[in-house]
From Swiss-Prot:
Residues exposed to the Extracellular side: 23-241
Keywords: Cell adhesion, Cell membrane, Disulfide bond, Glycoprotein, Growth regulation, Immunoglobulin domain, Membrane, Methylation, Receptor, Repeat, Signal, Transmembrane, Transmembrane helix
Cytoplasmic side: 263-437
GO biological process, one term: cell-cell adhesion via plasma-membrane adhesion molecules
InterPro entries: Ig-like_dom, Ig-like_dom_sf, Ig-like_fold, Ig_sub, Ig_sub2, Ig_V-set, IGSF11
Residue intervals of the Ig-like V-type domain: 23-136
Subcellular location: Cell membrane
Membrane topology, record value: Single-pass type I membrane protein
Protein name, per record: Immunoglobulin superfamily member 11
Residues annotated as glycosylated: N102
Length: 437
C-alpha cells in the first residue's frame, strides 16, 4: 500500500512533522541534597527535532527563605551565557558545552541560602508545544554545630537537675542523645531523656549521680558532641566556730535589748518621781497654844503668825522719866494689843496708883520705870492696834514711830524673857517660794 496520489498523504506528512518538531523536557529525578560547602548538580534535559540555533535556556530559583521573590540563576540566549543574581556569581555554570540538549547546571560552594526550588525553562524555535519546564529541589544540609551543654537546678544532694543540650545550626534538625561516660554508658535510673529537645531530667540526685555526661547531636550528614561534669554536693557539717559565733551574737543582742529596756524603765521611773514631787504641796504645821498662866498672875500670851520676813524682835524702851524722883510706880494701865496675830505689846506705865508690879510668879518688885516689851512679826502693811484699858476696848491707829534722842533698842536675853513669863514658841520657816514648811 502506498500513499502516492492519495489525498490523505499531505495530512499524514504534516502530522508526522508536527510530532517530530515538538519539544519535551525530561522529568527531574527529584530533590538533590548536598552538604554545605560541596558542589550540587541540578539536572535538566530536553528533546527537540529542530536545530539548536535559536536555543533559549533560563534557570530560576524560588528560595526557601523567601518564596515570594524568585531569582535568576543563569541565562543562555543567542549562543551566550549571562549571570543571574549577584550571590551566584562565579559559582554557577552549565555542566556541558552549549548549545546542547543537556542544560544541567552546577553550583559550587553551596550555602544554606541556596536551599530552594529550581526551575529549568527551555525554548527552541521553531519547536513549540509540549512541556518545556523542569523542576528540581535543592536542599543544602548543615551538620550540627558544636552543642552547648549546661546544668539547670541545684546540685545539692536530693535535688532535681536538668541537663540541657542544643546546637545553633543543623539541617535537618539534629537529635540529641545523652549518655554517662562510665562502664555502663547508661543514665541513672531516675533520669528521663527527651532526644528531640535535648534534655535529661535527673530526680533526687545522689552521690552515684556524679560523673561525666556526654551529649551527641546528630543528623543525616554529621555529628557533634559536648561534655558535662555533674558533681553532687553533699551537705557539709557546720563548724563549731560558726555555731559558737551565732550563739554569741544572739547573746549579745539579747543583753543589749535587756539593757535598753532597763534603761528606759529607770528613766521613766525617775521622770514620774520628779513629777510627783512637784505636785505634792508643802505641809504647814502650826504650833500648839502655850500653857495657861495661873490665876494669881496676869497671863502673858503671845502668838506669832507667818510673814514674809518671819522675824522675832524684842525691844526695851525707856525714857528720861525713868530716873524721876517718884519712888513708887504703880501699875495703873495694862494694855494688851493684838494686831492680827502679828504684833503684841505689854507695857507698864508709871502713875499715881500704889499698886506695885506683880509678875507671873507672884513676887512683888520695886517700882519699875516705864518699860515696854514689844514682840513683832513684820508684814508689809500697817494695821490699827487694839488696846484694852480699864475694861474698855478701843481700836486706835498706831502712829508711825517718831525717832527720839532718849529711845534705845536692845535685845532681851533669854533669862529676862523667862523671868517675865514669856513662853517659847516655834517660829515657822519660809522657803524662797513664799510657802511655809
Amino acid at each position: 500500500m502506498t500513499c502516492r496520489g492519495s489525498p490523505l498523504a499531505p495530512l499524514l506528512l504534516f502530522s508526522l512533522h508536527g510530532v517530530a518538531a515538538s519539544l519535551e523536557v525530561s522529568e527531574s529525578p527529584g530533590s538533590v541534597q548536598v552538604a554545605r560547602g560541596q558542589t550540587a548538580v541540578l539536572p535538566c534535559t530536553f528533546t527537540t527535532s529542530a536545530a539548536l540555533i535559536n536555543l533559549n535556556v533560563i534557570w530560576m530559583v524560588i528560595p526557601l527563605s523567601n518564596a515570594n521573590q524568585p531569582e535568576q540563576v543563569i541565562l543562555y540566549q543567542g549562543g551566550q551565557m549571562f549571570d543571574g543574581a549577584p550571590r551566584f556569581h562565579g559559582r554557577v555554570g552549565f555542566t556541558g558545552t552549549m548549545p546542547a540538549t543537556n542544560v544541567s547546571i552546577f553550583i559550587n560552594n553551596t550555602q544554606l541560602s541556596d536551599t530552594g526550588t529550581y526551575q529549568c525553562l527551555v525554548n527552541n524555535l521553531p519547536d513549540r508545544g509540549g512541556r518545556n519546564i523542569g523542576v528540581t529541589g535543592l536542599t543544602v544540609l548543615v551538620p550540627p554545630s558544636a552543642p552547648h551543654c549546661q546544668i539547670q537546678g541545684s546540685q545539692d544532694i536530693g535535688s532535681d537537675v536538668i541537663l540541657l543540650c542544643s546546637s545553633e545550626e543543623g539541617i535537618p534538625r539534629p537529635t540529641y542523645l545523652w549518655e554517662k561516660l562510665d562502664n555502663t554508658l547508661k543514665l541513672p535510673p531516675t533520669a528521663t531523656q527527651d532526644q528531640v529537645q535535648g534534655t535529661v531530667t535527673i530526680r533526687n540526685i545522689s552521690a552515684l549521680s556524679s560523673g561525666l555526661y556526654q551529649c551527641v547531636a546528630s543528623n543525616a550528614i554529621g555529628t557533634s558532641t559536648c561534655l558535662l561534669d555533674l558533681q553532687v554536693i553533699s551537705p557539709q557539717p557546720r563548724s563549731i566556730g560558726l555555731i559558737a559565733g551565732a550563739i554569741g551574737t544572739g547573746a549579745v543582742i539579747i543583753i543589749f535589748c535587756i539593757a535598753l529596756i532597763l534603761g528606759a524603765f529607770f528613766y521613766w521611773r525617775s521622770k514620774n518621781k520628779e513629777e510627783e514631787e512637784e505636785e505634792i504641796p508643802n505641809e504647814i504645821r502650826e504650833d500648839d497654844l502655850p500653857p495657861k498662866c495661873s490665876s494669881s498672875a496676869k497671863a502673858f500670851h503671845m502668838e506669832i503668825s507667818s510673814s514674809e520676813n518671819n522675824t522675832l524682835t524684842s525691844s526695851n524702851t525707856y525714857n528720861s522719866r525713868y530716873w524721876s524722883s517718884n519712888p513708887k510706880a504703880h501699875r495703873n494701865t495694862e494694855s494688851f494689843g493684838h494686831f492680827g496675830d502679828l504684833r503684841q505689846s505689854f507695857s507698864l506705865h508709871s502713875g499715881n496708883a500704889s499698886v506695885p508690879a506683880i509678875y507671873a510668879n507672884g513676887s512683888h518688885l520695886a517700882p519699875a520705870p516705864h518699860k515696854t516689851l514689844v514682840v513683832t512679826a513684820n508684814r508689809g502693811s500697817s494695821l490699827p492696834a487694839v488696846s484694852r484699858s480699864n475694861g474698855s476696848v478701843s481700836r486706835k491707829a498706831r502712829p508711825p514711830p517718831v525717832p527720839s534722842l532718849h529711845t534705845h533698842s536692845y535685845t532681851v536675853s533669854q533669862a529676862t524673857l523667862e523671868r517675865i513669863g514669856a513662853v517659847p514658841v516655834m517660829v515657822p520657816a519660809q522657803s524662797r517660794a513664799g510657802s511655809l514648811v
